[in-house]
Amino acid sequence: MDLSGVKKKSLLGVKENNKKSSTRAPSPTKRKDRSDEKSKDRSKDKGATKESSEKDRGRDKTRKRRSASSGSSSTRSRSSSTSSSGSSTSTGSSSGSSSSSASSRSGSSSTSRSSSSSSSSGSPSPSRRRHDNRRRSRSKSKPPKRDEKERKRRSPSPKPTKVHIGRLTRNVTKDHIMEIFSTYGKIKMIDMPVERMHPHLSKGYAYVEFENPDEAEKALKHMDGGQIDGQEITATAVLAPWPRPPPRRFSPPRRMLPPLPMWRRSPPRMRRRSRSPRRRSPARRRSRSPGRRRHRSRSSSNSSR
């Protein structure tokens, strides 16, 4: 009994030792597997951390870009607002040195532009003034130039030297007129028309021609409304007739041709008459013959039907 108990105890001790050894020292294969798993886990953790860090970096970059773009747009809007405020109100002061310098520049530029615009609107530039003055001077100088040209073209009207004397009595003769009008100047010619039936009687008017136009004017002043043989007369100046241009010779119309002689007219007419019936006769015969045949054929076909 004691031996069996000792054996049991020894077996139990061996089992416990085996258990302890199994728990204390694992096998080398298990150790390798565990080390591989740990290394894999570590590599996975590292990859995940790298990916997360890269993602974080990308997010940070995008955030920085957005913030930079928003900041630049905000700075642009601020600078534009400050410049507009500076141009509209030059007395307003800005907080920053950069904004103050920008506003002062924009204000100065706006003031210079406004001053230039006001000066341009109020008083035109010298070049515009010159242009306007040239236009005005040209427009003003055009009509007198035209008048001068017209005056140059029109020759000065000659002063009259001939005087018409009317309402004369039949007792007045050329000698009487010569005596009266010779007191005002030298007379070149006296024309006193006479009646055909009674050549010793005048028609009641006369023409007196002086050598100088001044003498003719004197005679007009003194004798217009004067009396000769107890009757008032009229004295008027006679203007010299304008020299008429010679009449133009009208050229004969080109369409009208000179008539042909008789010996040329007759042969072509005879030839035309002789040729025309010869040409027409065969054409008429040809045109009639097929018509008759067709008419006959149609009538025959109708009768057969």
Swiss-Prot record:
Cross-link (Glycyl lysine isopeptide (Lys-Gly) (interchain with G-Cter in SUMO2)), chain numbering: K7, K15
Molecular function terms, GO-annotated: RNA binding
Highest rank taxon of the organism: Eukaryota
Domain spans labelled RRM: 161-240
Record's keyword annotation contains Cytoplasm: yes
Record's compositionally biased regions (Pro residues): 242-261
UniProtKB keywords: Acetylation, Cytoplasm, Isopeptide bond, mRNA processing, mRNA splicing, Nonsense-mediated mRNA decay, Nucleus, Phosphoprotein, RNA-binding, Ubl conjugation
Compositionally biased tracts (Basic residues): 1-10, 127-143, 151-167, 266-298
Gene Ontology cellular-component terms listed: ASAP complex; cytoplasm; nuclear speck; nucleoplasm
Compartmental location: Nucleus; Nucleus speckle; Cytoplasm
Protein name: RNA-binding protein with serine-rich domain 1
